[in-house]
Amino acid sequence: MNLQEAINKRHSVREYERKIIPKKILIELIKDASKAPSAKNEQNYKFYIVNSKKKRDIVAKYLKSTLKLMNKQINKLEENLKKVLINFYSDLGGAQTIIFVYRKKIKNSPEYQFPNDLAGISCAIENLMLSAVSRGLGTCWIGSFKEPKIEKDLNKLMNVKEDEELITSILVGYPKKGYKPLIRKKKKLKEIIKFI
């Protein structure tokens, strides 16, 4: 699969086969993520990969608990989308692997005040997602674990150092056979581009 095919094929997957991804493939995903550009080549990120059933099930419970926090937003959605999200948040959509992306806190540093390292992290995540697509995997970027109590519990579960902070998480897995992604309308090019 070439790059353009991977870009066009990539979408959020919210239903997965209950199949473990081999560690070798996960390492390849992180290797590809680490090739992304970052300001001053700092690569201020660390990937915590939850790939064991026991810890995965604990993480699934954490995500399910965020449904209560999002109740108002979910109730505003149309019925089919509401059903998809409730199922997704109830069991990670069946995904067996969750990758948590952390960064090292850099206190009293100008870089900490500006989003340079966040841009680098985002580039790394996109590399990871495109790499996953090229290997027949699906991904879904989720930020719901940033709720303070859940983040604290996650840090304890994964033995995260105090000088690291959670940025986001990505589910990775084999898309469920017959899965049809939600069709999300993208902005028209004229809305996001301006030639000067």
Residue ranges and their predicted role:
Residues 1-94, 196:
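N-terminal amphipathic, basic helical "cap/leader" segment at the start of enzyme domains
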Residues 33-34, 99, 105-154:
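Small-aliphatic-rich amphipathic alpha-helix that forms the alpha element of a beta-alpha
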Residues 17, 86, 102-110, 193:
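Helix-biased detector of long, well-ordered alpha-helical tracts
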Residues 39, 133-135, 161-163:
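Arginine/glycine-rich "motif VI" loop of SF2 helicases in the C-terminal RecA-like domain
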Residues 48-50, 99-102:
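Short, conserved beta-strand edge motifs with alternating hydrophobic and charged residues
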Residues 94-97, 137, 162-166:
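Short coil/turn connectors at secondary-structure junctions
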Residues 152-165:
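Short, electropositive alpha-helical surface patch
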Residues 3-13, 86, 165-196:
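C-terminal helix-cap and adjacent tail motif
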